[in-house]
Amino acid sequence: MTDSDYTVIMPFFNEENTLEIAVTNLVKEDFASEIILVNDGSNDKSYEIASSLQNKHKFIKLIESKENKGKGHALKLGINVASKKFIGVLDADLEYSPNDLKNLFKEIDINNLDIVCGSRFIGDFKRDNIYVRTYLANKFLSMFFSIIHREKVTDIATCLKVFRKTLFDSIDLKANGFSIEVEILAKTLSKSDYFKEFPISYTARSYEEGKKIKLIDGFR
């Protein structure tokens, strides 16, 4: 694995069908020198898979929460132990591409930014299977967020983000669930104006396939 200033946090809950593929794809991209897997109380074989991956790769750390407390809780656990200059987040469900995350890291590093968020609604990138109601709700929330925080944001619900680690020294994250996506951006933007969105691809999975985030999470 490359020697870089990049940490990737991958929270997971009951992702036995995708976790190994997600981590393997991330490792192949060879840009993160620290990968933190956070088990959010899985009751399938996810933890065993993660443990095997940790044993295989010395740059992988594994954190376990015995109870399922939510993505926000898992992210906070990962942030607390991250040791690199920049922190990125990648879900284990294969909806987002690790290659896109690599591009976000390059963007934040080369241009001396503090926050870079992937957006599914700029550029000509692939966007498969997005529910119409999800798209419309996201557009409304993004517009509302942009007005409140005086920063144009086109994809408030994106789960692909990169931050300068020092931002977390002066903010207190409260959310334990999926509303962390909105809170983490709102609070980091309050500490920095060096923000940019970057186009990314996206392949949505259905609720039958294990999708967990719901429309209501954006309003919490």
Where are these regions (language model features)?
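Catalytic donor-sugar/metal-binding loop of nucleotide-sugar-dependent glycosyltransferases
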Residues: K152, K174-N176, L185-T203
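Acceptor/aglycone-binding surface of glycosyltransferases and processive sugar-polymer synthases
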Residues: K66-V81, F86, P98-F178, A204-R220
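A conserved acidic beta->alpha catalytic loop
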Residues: N39-E48, L94
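Short, well-formed alpha-helical segments that are part of the catalytic scaffolds
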Residues: E15-K28
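Cell-envelope/extracellular polymer assembly enzymes that use nucleotide-activated donors
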Residues: D5-T7, E34, E183
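Donor nucleotide-sugar binding loop of glycosyltransferases
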Residues: E15-T18, S42, K71, S97
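Conserved donor nucleotide-binding strand/loop of the catalytic core
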Residues: S33-I36, Y47-V81
